[in-house]
């Protein structure tokens, strides 16, 4: 708004409030943190919102006046914590700082917004998860006109920016399903969606990202290069841009434009656009991620996930890389084998592995620390951590170089024929040693920066520059002099006093200090005649005179300003040191990336050794054969030796569809998830929990496991099940692995059976993929008679009286019973209900008719002559409640530990339950 257009109300505002209104007008969608002295203040609607969100006291500015406005504030030194809480709630925060030193500025202090913090653009350590990337996602429609429907064809551009690590990747995906799968895989904190893609934005908002924003600004493809040049820390050449599809480049431009506008005046720490070829990865969509609990358990936590089992990395960068590999396993045979070679190398050399992991434990987060330096946000403590990490890096390299005969390994075929030791490693050295040797020999440890940081910083630098105390004594003479004056003020004054006594011959001369007069020289009346002309009289007192001199004034000035001069010098030295680190940021990040890769390989080797995993034989073939496979997560939490391993073999040229039956709790779902997790581990480049494993490459894993609804969308459990099933039938290919659990159970028996039957036929006939299909519909087992590629398997259980024992062992052939009543008993269903259920079950299994003439058994083929089951028969069919209580009490008795007196008391109790006398 131009000044001439300002309303009358604005003219009544104070100058500082006009500053506030101007800044707020530039960022109406953000909460404005307005710096006033030692506080960030918020006004009007922002103040009300923040006071409620953060439980702050709401006050008023100009209380009782016509221009009274709500106000709330937070101390500037504690602002990061409050900002983090607002970001977690999905808000943006604009930070408006004072420009310059208020003590040196007359009148109104200039202010400007220096940064807008959004959920996807965070760099503060305390607001980041050290073991996961913090992505801003940007989605572009490629510049071509399209409809609003999510099902409209692609391509779409997708870019991921992690400001904290300086990573920028971009890809082009062919359709919306792939786009959403990639968004789910990246788990961005914020998604920026082009305005012509409203359905994509709505779908993205349902994912785990905190916010899905609409990017309203048009993006002219002709200006994309200039946008990237303006934002990135180094120009991205036209040749480099030509390597990427246009939709990918446009998405990257959206991400960088948004980041640059949120950090005006600062370059984004990006040097290149990294390609991300989705065709080279094993696709795991959001549903499969959730069902398999790869990185997030059903309760939202990490415990009970595959990541929790395999992540024993010792660096934050290694943890982030492992997480990315877990969510993006490879579908490229050569890449998988290279990773497995590196893991095998560390499996085969436990001593080098241990030394490497010990050294890496001191490396810290070199990647994020170097980026913070580049952004001008690194603290003295950050640089201290960077120094410690660089100091530890040479030991990590030495550990790799210590591997015997590194670099002399012969290429080893991946057919599993080589003899294997306890750790499942092939005899002889791995071919992974050759690239490792080259990396270890050529790795730049940035020794010059390490040496400068070591010479400059104290052992434990402070968290900020406000108090000083950052640099070692002897690093800078000017700083040492200022510190010396501040530290030795008393000694310097006493030395001057002694000098003046000698010069004047006045033994009563004293150098003293008061707040009113500062430092002065006091001489008693008896010696006033000895005072030299260079002394200037300041005050007459009863006992004598007070003076000053040029020498005293100079020393007093040094003492008075020594602390400020030392702090000013330290600040200048720190800025220079941080700039030195920033200049070396590219070298530091290259070192960090390589150490992270070593960390992942050594960590997976350690997991393989401790958990008795083996190297999988990954092939381009069509077989998926696992001998004595184990579920890595269930095994972790099961008692030692209690997990029952099972064999699996799915082959596109043999049995490719397994129909698995058996009772609930027998382990059907565990078995299916186990197979999928072993495939994920193998294709991410990890050893697997099995005795042997042959993995024919899988292009995607699709799952329908468990029961859930979506109240927000108004979808029932059955609707969610059918939607997920439809996605599987649409997306599965011949190379896919499909796991389906209990399709059709959310509707009537006949409808459910019909759907399950048709789905199984479609998987086998139309798609022809490898699939595991668990069901309670025993009628489905008849499918095996129509094709040799469909096989029946069951999870074994045995009856012992009224009890059922789950053996968790896979057997050929269908299950004979479901043992549902036995499971209900284990769950604590009352005995009377169980007895009634047994009676009804017996009638159903005998082929009796239900009320209304419908046949009770799907297996039955006749309707006439069957006795009708009366569902409302008198209660004599059930055990009376008092008898049920007696039965349950007797079941709980441990006869072997029952003393005679306790037995008498028990009999009395049972008689009481039956209504008998005591």
UniProtKB/Swiss-Prot annotation:
CDD domains: ABC_MutS1. ATP binds at residues 662-669. The keyword Disulfide bond does not apply. The keyword DNA-binding applies. Keywords: ATP-binding, DNA damage, DNA repair, DNA-binding, Nucleotide-binding. Belongs to the DNA mismatch repair MutS family. This is DNA mismatch repair protein MutS. It comes from Sorangium cellulosum (strain So ce56).
């Amino acid at each position: 708004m131009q000044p001439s257009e300002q309303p009358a109300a604005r003219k009544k505002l104070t100058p500082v409030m006009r500053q506030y209104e101007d800044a707020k007008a530039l960022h109406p969608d953000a909460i404005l943190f307005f710096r006033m002295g030692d506080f960030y203040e918020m006004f009007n609607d922002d103040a009300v919102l923040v006071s409620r969100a953060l439980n702050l006291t709401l006050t008023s500015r100009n209380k009782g006046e016509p221009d009274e406005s709500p106000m709330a504030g937070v101390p500037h030194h504690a602002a990061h914590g409050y900002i983090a809480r607002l970001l977690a709630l999905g808000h943006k925060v604009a930070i408006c700082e004072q420009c310059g030193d208020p003590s040196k500025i007359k009148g109104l202090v200039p202010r400007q917004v220096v940064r807008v913090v959004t959920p996807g653009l965070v760099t503060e350590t305390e607001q980041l998860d050290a073991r996961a990337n913090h992505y801003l996602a940007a989605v572009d429609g490629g510049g071509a006109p399209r409809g609003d429907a999510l099902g409209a064809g692609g391509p779409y551009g997708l870019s991921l920016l992690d400001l904290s690590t300086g990573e920028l990747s971009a890809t082009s995906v062919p359709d919306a399903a792939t786009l959403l799968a990639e968004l789910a895989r990246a788990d961005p904190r914020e998604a920026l969606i082009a305005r012509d893609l409203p359905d994509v934005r709505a779908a993205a908002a349902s994912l785990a990202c905190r916010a899905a924003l609409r990017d309203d600004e048009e993006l002219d493809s002709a200006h994309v290069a200039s946008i990237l040049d303006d934002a990135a820390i180094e120009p991205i050449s036209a040749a480099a841009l030509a390597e990427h599809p246009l939709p990918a480049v446009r998405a990257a431009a959206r991400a960088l434009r948004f980041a640059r506008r949120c950090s005006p005046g600062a370059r984004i720490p990006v040097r290149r656009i990294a390609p991300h070829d989705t065709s080279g990865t094993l696709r795991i969509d959001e549903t499969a991620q959730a069902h398999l609990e790869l990185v997030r358990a059903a309760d939202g936590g990490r415990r009970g996930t595959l990541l929790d089992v395999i992540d024993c990395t010792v660096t934050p960068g290694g943890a982030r890389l492992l997480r990315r590999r877990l969510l993006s396993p490879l579908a490229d045979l050569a890449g998988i084998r290279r990773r497995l070679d590196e893991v095998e190398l560390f499996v085969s050399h436990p001593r080098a592995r241990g030394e490497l992991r010990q050294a890496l434990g001191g490396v810290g987060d070199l990647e994020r620390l170097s980026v913070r330096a580049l952004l001008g946000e690194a603290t003295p403590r950050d640089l201290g951590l960077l120094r410690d990490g660089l100091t530890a890096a040479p030991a990590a390299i030495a550990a790799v170089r210590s591997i015997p005969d590194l670099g002399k390994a012969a290429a080893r075929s991946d057919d599993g024929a080589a003899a294997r030791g306890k750790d499942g490693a092939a005899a002889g050295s791995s071919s992974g040693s050759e690239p490792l040797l080259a990396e270890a020999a050529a790795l730049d440890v940035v020794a010059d920066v390490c040496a400068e940081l070591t010479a400059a910083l104290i052992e434990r630098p402070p968290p900020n520059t406000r108090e000083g105390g950052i640099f070692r004594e002897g690093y800078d003479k000017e700083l040492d002099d200022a510190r010396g004056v501040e530290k030795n003020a008393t000694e310097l004054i006493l030395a001057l006093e002694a000098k003046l006594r000698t010069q004047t011959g006045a033994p009563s001369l004293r150098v003293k200090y008061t707040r009113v007069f500062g430092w002065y020289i006091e001489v008693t009346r008896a010696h006033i005649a000895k005072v030299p002309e260079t002394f200037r009289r300041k005050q007459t007192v009863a006992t004598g005179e007070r003076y000053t001199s040029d020498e005293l004034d100079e020393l007093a000035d040094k003492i008075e300003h020594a602390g400020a001069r030392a702090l000013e010098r330290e600040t200048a030295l720190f800025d220079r040191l941080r700039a030195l680190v920033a200049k070396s940021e590219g070298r530091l990040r290259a070192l960090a990336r390589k150490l992270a890769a070593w960390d992942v390989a050594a960590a997976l080797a350690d997991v393989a050794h401790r958990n008795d995993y083996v190297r999988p034989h990954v092939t381009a073939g069509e077989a998926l054969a696992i001998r004595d496979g184990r579920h890595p997560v269930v095994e972790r939490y099961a008692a030692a030796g209690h997990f029952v391993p099972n064999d699996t073999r799915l082959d596109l040229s043999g049995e490719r569809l397994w129909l698995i039956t058996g009772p609930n709790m027998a382990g059907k779902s565990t078995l299916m998830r186990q197979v999928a997790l072993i495939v994920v581990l193998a294709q991410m480049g990890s050893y697997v929990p099995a005795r042997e494993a042959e993995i024919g490459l899988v292009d995607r894993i699709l799952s329908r496991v468990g029961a859930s609804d979506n109240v927000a969308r108004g979808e029932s459990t059955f609707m969610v099940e059918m939607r997920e099933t439809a996605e599987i039938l649409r997306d599965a290919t011949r190379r896919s692995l499909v796991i389906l659990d209990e399709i059709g159970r959310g509707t009537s028996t006949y409808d459910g059976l019909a759907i399950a039957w048709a789905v199984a036929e479609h998987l086998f006939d139309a798609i022809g993929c490898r699939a595991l299909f668990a069901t309670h519909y025993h009628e489905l087992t008849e499918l095996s008679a129509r094709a040799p590629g469909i096989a029946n398997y069951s999870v074994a259980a045995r009856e012992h009286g009224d009890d059922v024992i789950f053996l968790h062992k896979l057997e050929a052939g269908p299950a004979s019973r479901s043992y549902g009543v036995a499971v209900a008993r284990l769950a604590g269903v009352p005995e009377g209900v169980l007895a009634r259920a047994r009676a009804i079950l017996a009638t159903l299994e005998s082929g009796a008719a239900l009320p209304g003439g419908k046949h009770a058994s799907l297996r039955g083929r006749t309707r006439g002559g069957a006795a009708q089951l009366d569902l409302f028969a008198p209660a004599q069919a059930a055990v009376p409640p008092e008898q049920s209580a007696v039965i349950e009490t007797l079941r709980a008795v441990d006869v072997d530990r029952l003393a005679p007196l306790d037995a008498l008391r028990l009999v009395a109790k049972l008689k009481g339950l039956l209504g008998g006398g005591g």
